[in-house]
């Protein structure tokens, strides 16, 4: 039996751009992708903290520092300045799942990583 777990998370990033006319995806600062362990073209779930919208797309790495840009149809689901949580998931067998810990990246208002951990404590905001 396989179990799907949170693999990686970029927590409360600020949307810096929304480009409706661009081919669909989410462009993310490559430093954030590397810090989180999310790969370019990996499927991600994006949750908009401001309006509750949830959607899936794939990532595109950008060398532009601090960029989190929603592209294509996803651009209708957030406004510049909205806070989003970007998550990827992976399948594990039962034994792997018992010991796996996700990588969680906390960012500041400029989308610069401030803390990287593999643990989230309920009720704590880093």
UniProtKB/Swiss-Prot annotation:
EC number: 4.1.1.11
GO annotation, cellular component aspect: cytosol
Gene3D superfamilies the record matches: 2.40.40.20
Needed cofactors: pyruvate
One of the GO BP terms on file: alanine biosynthetic process
UniProt catalytic activity: L-aspartate + H(+) = beta-alanine + CO2
Active site (catalytic residues): 25 (schiff-base intermediate with substrate), 58 (proton donor)
Pfam families referenced in this protein's UniProt entry, alphabetically: Asp_decarbox (PF02261)
Known partners and oligomeric status: Heterooctamer of four alpha and four beta subunits.
Protein name: Aspartate 1-decarboxylase
Gene source species: Campylobacter jejuni subsp. jejuni serotype O:2 (strain ATCC 700819 / NCTC 11168)
Name of the gene encoding the protein in the UniProt record: panD
